[in-house]
Amino acid sequence: MIPFFGQSWSVFAPEPINGNFTLKVRAQTRQDGKDQTTDWVDATAVEVSLIKHNLFPPRAGIQAMELASEFKSNWDALSADHKVVVGLGYYVGTDWPIRLNKKLQSYGNPQAVAAYLESENTVIKYSTQVAKAIWGDSVVRVQFQIYRQNVVPFKDRKTPSPQPLQIANVGWRGLEIAPGQSDQDFADVFRKQYEKMR
């Protein structure tokens, strides 16, 4: 999908864009004092379904893909130690973002950490909207999974053996809401599209 919606010089480069990014979201909901983990929802597939067979596709149909692409680039720039920390759950209390930042900074490379945390924060806000759109106000925390799947090169098309998914593992996170964010407007569009796909 990316070559069609990421039209830039890189589409025609010697090594053109050759993979798809996916953003999946799941949540933990609390009912009667018990937490339950939901199934994964492929937010990218829901958004792409807005574009499919649509002569005038909305820009909303590529948000998850763009977020996933930027996030994966920033995640790739982290060290192995950083990635271990990112894979842990940070959601207890209101200071979990500060604790996560402090722990990541302790492993150095402050520029990569800052870029990563900025993209993670954006994806958490998006994941919060997705989770609330599907599971409502019982959502207490979210987890997202972002991965890239390379496309089989044209010369190897007759013997396809797709490379393994390049997964960015992230632990559970507390909910984040952007100022001015309308959960209701998002839910009206996203939930309707999600229900069509089921």
Task: Show the residue positions of the predicted features.
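Short extracytoplasmic
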Residues: 2-28
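A composition-driven signal for long, intrinsically disordered, charge-rich low-complexity tracts
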Residues: 7, 11, 55, 148-153
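Generic structural signal for residues positioned in beta-strands
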Residues: 8, 24, 42, 141-145
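Tryptophan-centered motif/residue detector
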Residues: 9, 37-43, 172, 176
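Secondary-structure boundary elements
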Residues: 16-18, 31-33, 131-138
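Structured domain cores in non-transmembrane regions
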Residues: 18-122
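Glycine-rich, aromatic-bearing surface loops/beta-hairpins
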Residues: 96-198
